[in-house]
Amino acid sequence: MERGEGRRGDCSVQVRKKRTRRKSDGPDSIAETIKWWKEQNQKLQEENSSRKAPAKGSKKGCMAGKGGPENSNCAYRGVRQRTWGKWVAEIREPNRGRRLWLGSFPTALEAAHAYDEAARAMYGPTARVNFADNSTDANSGCTSAPSLMMSNGPATIPSDEKDELESPPFIVANGPAVLYQPDKKDVLERVVPEVQDVKTEGSNGLKRVCQERKTMEVCESEGIVLHKEVNISYDYFNVHEVVEMIIVELSADQKTEVHEEYQEGDDGFSLFSY
């Protein structure tokens, strides 16, 4: 009984140590650790001695099937993606030290820059970095990063597309845009032939002639050619109404009596009065 109680007491005394992660600020923070390694490298440079270059390591990152969906397409050193999409960066301290957590970042590019900053502080000029000093981006990095999809250089055009672009006579330049002004001789007195559609409609013996005219007018104003289409429709007079008016006038002339009076003038001429 006593042995059992003693064993139970020993188990209760043993407490599992909790692994603590370094904070971003404080005496044992990431910034303080990087600062300390930077000071150590400066001392080595003053003593004309250099630190051993870090091992090349592997760029495989997480194991196959592990990490985020874009982790397999990223080749940045010290960068990997979590399953929920965040990018993290970590670096191993010199002299086979432990891995230093650098933090989580929204993009792989930011995580790669954080790794380079820590690598230069820890290893000095012999550090293996993702980007050189004179470049901000790398073409061999993460293909999924949107910032790497755009290049500052001129875009290459396939040969088939070049032929299509070179065929038109117009050339687009980077200079100020110039408005093309055609020659006045080619523009003036140019009128599109008129199209006339004549429609005849009959109803109760009445005929109505409707004429539709479509005219294209070409106007020139300050070197800019304006094409204007005018639709004109004319409704002419009613033929039947005109005929009725003529018949009425003729019948009225027949009913009126014509009075003719012969008068002799002094000058010998014959005068008729109506």
UniProtKB/Swiss-Prot annotation:
PROSITE patterns from the UniProt entry: AP2_ERF
Domain of life: Eukaryota
Any matching Pfam family: AP2
Subcellular location(s) per record: Nucleus
SMART domains in alphabetical order: AP2 (SM00380)
Encoding gene, per UniProt annotation: DREB2A
Name the record gives this protein: Dehydration-responsive element-binding protein 2A
Protein family per UniProt: Belongs to the AP2/ERF transcription factor family. ERF subfamily.
CDD domains in UniProt: AP2
Gene Ontology BP, a term: positive regulation of DNA-templated transcription
A GO cellular component entry from the record: nucleus
